[in-house]
């Protein structure tokens, strides 16, 4: 029978990932005699079984008590937040109005006309381009920059950060000034319109209880895509970038777990957190000399950024920003005021 496995997981090339998982089971079943080789051939036949790629974009943070209150006022009954002993979580979903779903149009047995509901069907290459537009330029880099600086400046809501002229100015410059000139244009969506909606409608949405602490999670796994790809796109001109390096310096400053008032705060989870903090051990607020040579193992790490930031001419610039960010209390704010005109 012809069949399509459509993944809506929010990750790049999600169709390949579900295909790999299913083939792992199929191969093991064949090896154990549970299924014959013909079954493996069937799963591998693109005329019969497909694994379309998709790109989904709709900011959906953890369910909010504020939204729960709204729902109760409206008479919505089932609003309990369920936490299980195994750490799983079941609840209502609070999300934004904006939504994008782009799907590779490979369905061997036909499909519903979901384009009538706004779904974009296209080829695999275009799905990938939409993903790159969002993740490398128009949304995710802005999210990460405002997350690390938001934590340093004591914010707990993304919408509140958008009222901060320096944070708002920083992400506008990262997006419009440094991102759009090298953006991947997918054709089916306009990058400039997309980023305008992000900045003017999505991130400013006070009814969406998204937090910089959530977005700051796993930053070491994100910066290579969110900043590293744009750095690569600039080639020899990467050394002229100003605001992406400032965002990276902000992440390094964030890793000290000391806010702009000089008070300790809890860092969000990250698989490399212990190693990153060990590399920065000994750096103290108020003593820029204590940072000498400490950032190199992070900024030169190609596994993190996709390139050695010293080799592309940004390492020393980021170190300079970082030194300014640790001059003392309020140095984060003062540095942003200085560079974000």
Q: What are these model-derived regions, one by one?
A:
Residues 1-341:
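Substrate/ligand-engaging "lid" and interaction regions
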């Amino acid at each position: 029978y012809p069949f399509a496995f459509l993944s809506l997981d929010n990750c790049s090339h999600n169709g390949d990932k579900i295909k790999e998982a299913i083939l792992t089971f199929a191969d093991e079943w064949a090896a154990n005699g549970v299924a014959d080789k013909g079954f493996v051939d069937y799963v591998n036949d693109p005329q019969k079984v497909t694994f379309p790629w998709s790109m989904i974009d709709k900011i959906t943070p953890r369910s909010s008590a504020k939204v729960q209150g709204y729902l109760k006022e409206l008479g919505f009954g089932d609003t309990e937040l369920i936490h299980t002993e195994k750490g799983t979580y079941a609840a209502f979903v609070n999300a934004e109005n904006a939504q994008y779903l782009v799907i590779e149009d490979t369905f061997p047995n036909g499909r519903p006309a979901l384009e009538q509901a706004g779904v974009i069907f296209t080829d695999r290459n275009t799905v990938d381009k939409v993903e790159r537009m969002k993740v490398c330029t128009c949304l995710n880099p802005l999210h990460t920059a405002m997350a690390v600086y938001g934590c340093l400046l004591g914010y707990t809501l993304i919408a509140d950060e958008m009222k901060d002229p320096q944070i708002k100015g920083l992400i506008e410059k990262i997006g419009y000034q440094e991102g759009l000139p090298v953006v991947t244009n997918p054709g089916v969506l306009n990058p400039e319109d997309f980023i305008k909606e992000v900045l003017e409608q999505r991130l400013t949405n006070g009814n969406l209880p998204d937090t910089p602490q959530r977005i700051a999670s796993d930053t070491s796994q994100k910066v290579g895509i969110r900043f590293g790809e744009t750095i690569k796109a600039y080639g020899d001109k990467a050394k002229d970038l100003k605001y992406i390096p400032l965002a990276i310096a902000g992440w390094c400053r964030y890793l000290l777990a000391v806010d702009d008032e000089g008070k300790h705060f809890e860092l969000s989870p990250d698989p490399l957190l212990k190693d990153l903090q060990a590399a920065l051990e000994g750096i103290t607020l108020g003593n820029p000399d204590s940072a000498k040579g400490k950032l190199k193992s992070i900024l030169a790490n190609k596994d993190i950024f996709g390139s050695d930031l010293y080799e592309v001419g940004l390492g020393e610039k980021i170190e300079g920003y970082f030194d300014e960010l640790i001059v003392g209390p309020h140095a984060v704010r003062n540095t942003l005021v200085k560079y974000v005109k």
